[in-house]
Amino acid sequence: MTNIRKSHPLVKIINSSFIDLPAPSNISSWWNFGSLLGICLALQILTGLFLAMHYTSDTATAFNSVTHICRDVNYGWVLRYLHANGASMFFICLYLHVGRGLYYGSYMYTETWNIGVILLFAVMATAFMGYVLPWGQMSFWGATVITNLLSAIPYIGTNLVEWIWGGFSVDKATLTRFFAFHFLLPFIIAAMVMVHLLFLHETGSNNPTGIPANADMIPFHPYYTIKDILGLLLMITALLTLVLFFPDLLGDPDNYTPANPLNTPPHIKPEWYFLFAYAILRSIPNKLGGVLALVLSILILIIVPLLHTSKQRSMTFRPLSQCLFWLLXADLFTLTWIGGXPVEHPYIIIGQLASILYFSIIXILMPLTSLVXXHLXXX
């Protein structure tokens, strides 16, 4: 009799995805972030579901309902801060996961990569809408500023913004629809994750050398299940430290003031995980130009596979490309810092230079370096 694990139509899908899956024997901890992202998503959906049971998406009561969750609901404060800081862990894992893909050439699996980029956009949209829901000052003004960017689109811009708002300003209609979409999108994301994995399992995982490892594969379970659990424990430790000791470390104090359309906060800025994109947006003095740069800062990932000029897949044996990669990372930290600083003399020019550098590294310097290295190798 065959094992139910291999014969049952449903169980055999799980088996071929998480148990008997052949995996390269040399993948490092940088390959842990996929499973961590899956767990982050599950955590966000669960905590979000329980928060939604007590939340009201009406401008008159939204802020108070969040206060009520924190004060009166059993362990409501844990749910709320797990959900808020879980988003931060989600984005840390997301950015490290993308960085891993860039470094080791995983983007050569184009279908998997492109679905990953779409997933990134979807998660960013979800996080943005979620930030609006508590209806604090930053929620309201963040929603106003970011939705207003669409008015830069020629001809249809203004109509588009008013259509999204459901009126002539960010109001009840906007909050209600943002809640609806914030609830819906994670399930769409979960479905897309399945497709992401489907395409990944067509090719199998990449590995740190960038050389096909078909000759040396090991079963996913127990080797990588136990390795993933270690990564999970580390992430949960970090998350719980954040939630139980520093729950408001990454938040904005302005969001503890109820939304007031008549009073603009001194510095409007998004959550930390959007600051790099916000800095790129602000570094261009033209509205439409800024919006385009903002979208392209993420969309540029789509064309990365086309810009691969090296003979080798991974950067493991390419010191020049490695230098550029870490310069890119430092540049992203710089942009994140600038995004949170006010629009004043030293910061403006730093932000502009960092933005130029960001696009130059990805689109010009990296392909050129790979070409040069290929010629050096040939010689």
Swiss-Prot record:
* GO annotations of cellular component type: mitochondrial inner membrane; respiratory chain complex III
Q: Which Pfam families match?
A: Cytochrom_B_C, Cytochrome_B
Q: Report residues binding heme b b566.
A: 97, 196
| Topology in the lipid bilayer | Multi-pass membrane protein
- Signal peptide feature range: none
What is the top-level taxon of the source organism? Eukaryota
Q: Which family does it belong to?
A: Belongs to the cytochrome b family.
Spell out the protein name for this chain.
Cytochrome b
